[in-house]
Amino acid sequence: MKKIVVLALATIPLVAAPLAQPPNRSSKLAVYAAVGEELIAFGVDVDHATLTRQSSVTLPGFVQEAWASPSAPFLYVAWSNGGSSYTGSGVTPVGDKHGVTAFRVDPSGALQVHGAPASLRSRPIHITGDVPGRHLLVAYNDPSGVSVHTIDADGSVGAEVPQPGGLDVGVYAHQVRVLPSNRAVVLVTRGNQPTASAKEDPGAVKVFRYDASTLTNRASIAPGKGFGFRSRHLDFHPTRPWVFLTLESQNTLGVFRRDDDSLGELPLFSRSTLPGAGGVIAGQTASTVHVHPNGRFVYVGNRAGGTTDFNGTPVFGGGTNNIAVFRINQETGEPSLIQNIETRGFTPRTFAIDPSGRMLVVGNQNTMAVRDGTTVKTVPPNVSVFRIRADGELDYMNSYDVAVGRKPLWWVGLVALP
């Protein structure tokens, strides 16, 4: 297996690359799974819902998130040597190096470094690009923030674009997305739960006007002034004006109307992502959300990773790790829960759907000790593959272990190959 090591902020000759055609439903695909600082490429057979492990690259810090250009064969990978991705990994975080590295994606899915990495101000928690693929947008959680960076004509990461002062970036940003019109940006800010020593920080979805790479404040969507509103991730319906938002500690899927490049102040619908009544459950949280390419279904990750003691060993303490499947009413946008299916691993932080809508790939994040009668077994992080049926429900197909010590599987994505 080929493995490439990427140096932090090294000077690397730029390589001009031809533009690829936009991905389509028949494109060949690669799955990328980030385990610590290693980004592993898998070949994909969508017809049989199988993966084949191929090459990997190593970043200067743990991979946080990645984004594939819609118009050229490049993958932009955000990384950091600090932050919560290091928790429980056995690696001590330093927290002094953060960046984005551009890779050219070849037809096999192998990655080649393209240009010098761009240094970032702090740990990036999410990365995306604008609709034409001319700029990168990066979200930061602590302190909360957002930055915009040019993508140069050759596909390399360019300069950061200065922004006006006074941007309302909330508390603990978790995701940044560009609206389909390319005229607005949303920063999903989670806030923080109250503790014995600190008051609750409210959550909100911050909406910015986006004009030629410049952000200006437009709206703050914060039902109940953001208290009890732990907004984490959102996704857009492909053809209707609906936005689907996960509320992390509330284990809830909210549906908001998208209108005039902003969001409605209150949700149209709120539904539990759990099989029961849902609500706040200790150790149980929602993760990311993706709308099916046909717009008829929406999928949400449910995570549980708490532990309890068993003969001196911390073992899984209960809860559910599953994907919630909702059918979307095409007239109103109302989601109806039709399935919760276990992910065959622990803490499904991220997942992805292939462009044809036939396969869903889950990244089960954590290593977990599990009680097995009178003994304890260890379940490593893994990539689980599911078939998506015509009715939207999922069938489990395969799992692939990706253990590297106790490093987490922090991100998984599907990318169309050139």
Role assignments for model-derived ranges:
Residues 42-49, 102-110, 148-157, 207-215, ...:
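Short loop/turn segments immediately following beta-strands, especially the blade-tip
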Residues 173-175, 231, 280-293, 348, ...:
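Signature of short aromatic-glycine-proline-rich micro-motifs recurring in repeat-based ectodomains
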Residues 56-60, 116-120, 164-169, 222-227, ...:
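Surface loop/turn motifs at the tips and blade-to-blade linkers of beta-strand repeat domains
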Residues 34-35, 84-97, 139-144, 194-203, ...:
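Short, solvent-exposed loop/turn segments at conserved positions within beta-propeller repeat blades
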Residues 111-180:
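Asp-box/WD-like beta-propeller blade repeats and closely related beta-sheet repeat scaffolds
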Residues 24-27, 70-72, 129-133, 180-181, ...:
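Residue-level detector of Asp-centered blade-edge/turn motifs that repeat once per structural unit
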